Amino acid sequence: MRLNELSPPPGSRRARKRVGRGEGSGYGKTSGRGQKGAKARSGTKAYTTYEGGQMPLQRRLPRLKGEARGRHTPAHPKVYDPVNVGELAAVEGDTIGLDELRAAGLIRKKADTLVKILGDGEIDRPVTVRAHAFSRAAREKIEAAGGRAEVL
């Protein structure tokens, strides 16, 4: 066997499609491009998000918050887990922090949870409450009972 006798196995190599070489080839006249339109022209390519004139998806969806709407709308506003003063009465101990609230099932177990104490309900014992935010009414009720409201 010599190099000039080598050839690929039959059927492993495919001949190049020669378009525009007569009707009998099946790729004559319009060369497999159909009739008119942008796809029939040379050198044109529709961008990937083109939907044929239909309103594109990125224009159908509402605009995002943040920079897209203007600088005054935060893209990711702080989300607090609310806990009412009345719910604090069920928590044992003189100091109530995030761990105690989690153990009582009043806030989510996620570590980055922000907690705000709200003023609904009453508390009748002095406690030190540690949270990320307090409403004015909650702070007044905690301090009226002889406790302290500490912001984390």
UniProtKB/Swiss-Prot annotation:
Keywords: Ribonucleoprotein, Ribosomal protein, RNA-binding, rRNA-binding. The gene is rplO. The lineage of its organism: Bacteria, Bacillati, Actinomycetota, Rubrobacteria, Rubrobacterales. GO terms for cellular component: cytosolic large ribosomal subunit. SUPFAM superfamilies: Ribosomal proteins L15p and L18e (SSF52080). PANTHER family: 50S RIBOSOMAL PROTEIN L15, LARGE RIBOSOMAL SUBUNIT PROTEIN UL15M. InterPro entries: Ribosomal_uL15 (IPR030878), Ribosomal_uL15/eL18 (IPR021131), Ribosomal_uL15/eL18_sf (IPR036227), Ribosomal_uL15_bac-type (IPR005749), Ribosomal_uL15_CS (IPR001196). GO terms for molecular function: rRNA binding; structural constituent of ribosome. This is Large ribosomal subunit protein uL15. NCBIfam families: rplO_bact. Residues 1-79 are annotated as: Disordered. One of its GO terms (biological process) is translation. Part of the 50S ribosomal subunit. Pfam families: Ribosomal_L27A (PF00828). The keyword Endoplasmic reticulum does not apply. The keyword rRNA-binding applies. Belongs to the universal ribosomal protein uL15 family. It comes from Rubrobacter xylanophilus (strain DSM 9941 / JCM 11954 / NBRC 16129 / PRD-1). Binds to the 23S rRNA. Residues 22-35 have a biased composition (Gly residues).
